[in-house]
C-alpha cells in the first residue's frame, strides 16, 4: 500500500500496465494525512481523513478497515471497520506502532489506541497532555519506549508520558530553525542503544532551501547525550 497525503490509498498491482491503483468503493477514504498498517492486529488505519459518506478531511479523525482487508471500509455489524475522533488537539501529527498499542500524537496530546474487540473495535485513551511533537518523523521506538522531540524539549513514553531530561536542551533549541520543524527526523541505532534526531539549525549554510545540518543523540542505556554537525 502507498500513502499519498490528501489523496486516496493506493495499492500495487504487479500485473497491470498502471501498477498504482487507487482503492475506491466500499467506503474507502478519499483523503487522508497518514497511514499505518498494524502487523499485530492486521488492520489498516488512516489518520486525518474523511468521515464515511463525506469527502471533507477531518484532521482529528481516525478510521480503520475491516480486519485482514484493505478494501472494506464501510462500518457494518458484519465487519470490524470503524472510526473514532480524538477530542484534544487540532490535528494528528504522528503515529507509531508499539508492542501493545498504537501511539497517536496530536499537536498538544498523546493518545494510546488499543483494540477493544466486539462492536467497539478500537478505543483511544489520553496518556499525555500539554506536550508537543516536532514533526511526523520525530518519533522513534526502542527498548519498550517511545522517544520524541517536541518543539522545546524531549519526551519519552513508557506507559506514562515524561519530559526527558536533556543537558543539551539549550544548545539544540537555542539555535533551532523554527521554520523547519517538519524536517526533524528520528532514528533508532539499536546496536549502540541510541536515538538520533536530525534537524535544521539557524546557522545552516543553505539559507534559501535549508536542510538538516545537525544531529543530537540520546543513549538510553547510559542516559547521556551527544551532538554533532552533518557535512553537506
Mark where each language-model region is:
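Asp-box/WD-like beta-propeller blade repeats and closely related beta-sheet repeat scaffolds
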Residues: 7-8, 13-37
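Beta-propeller blade signature
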Residues: 58-69, 212-222
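A short beta-strand motif characteristic of beta-propeller blades
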Residues: 18-26, 79-85, 123-129
Amino acid at each position: 500500500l502507498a500513502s499519498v497525503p490528501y489523496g486516496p490509498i493506493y495499492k500495487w498491482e504487479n500485473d497491470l500496465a498502471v501498477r498504482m491503483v487507487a482503492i475506491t468503493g466500499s467506503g474507502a477514504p478519499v483523503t487522508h494525512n497518514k497511514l499505518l498498517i498494524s502487523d499485530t492486529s492486521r488492520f489498516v488505519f488512516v489518520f486525518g481523513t474523511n468521515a464515511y459518506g463525506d469527502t471533507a478531511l477531518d484532521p482529528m479523525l481516525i478510521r480503520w478497515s475491516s480486519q485482514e482487508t484493505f478494501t472494506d471500509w464501510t462500518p457494518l455489524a458484519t465487519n470490524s471497520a470503524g472510526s473514532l475522533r480524538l477530542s484534544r488537539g487540532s490535528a494528528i501529527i504522528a503515529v507509531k506502532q508499539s508492542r501493545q498499542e498504537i501511539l497517536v500524537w496530536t499537536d498538544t496530546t498523546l493518545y494510546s489506541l488499543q483494540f477493544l474487540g466486539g462492536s467497539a473495535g478500537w478505543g483511544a485513551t489520553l496518556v499525555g497532555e500539554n506536550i508537543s511533537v516536532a514533526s511526523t518523523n520525530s518519533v522513534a521506538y526502542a527498548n519498550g519506549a517511545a522517544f520524541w522531540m517536541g518543539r522545546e524539549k524531549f519526551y519519552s513514553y513508557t506507559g506514562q508520558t515524561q519530559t526527558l531530561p536533556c543537558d543539551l536542551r539549550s544548545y539544540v533549541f537555542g539555535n533551532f530553525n523554527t521554520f523547519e520543524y517538519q524536517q526533524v527526523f528520528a532514528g533508532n541505532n539499536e546496536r549502540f542503544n541510541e536515538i538520533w534526531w536530525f534537524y535544521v539549525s539557524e546557522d545552516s549554510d543553505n539559507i534559501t532551501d535549508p536542510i538538516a545540518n545537525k544531529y543530537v543523540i540520546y543513549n538510553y542505556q547510559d542516559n547521556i547525550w551527544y551532538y554533532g554537525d552533518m557535512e553537506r
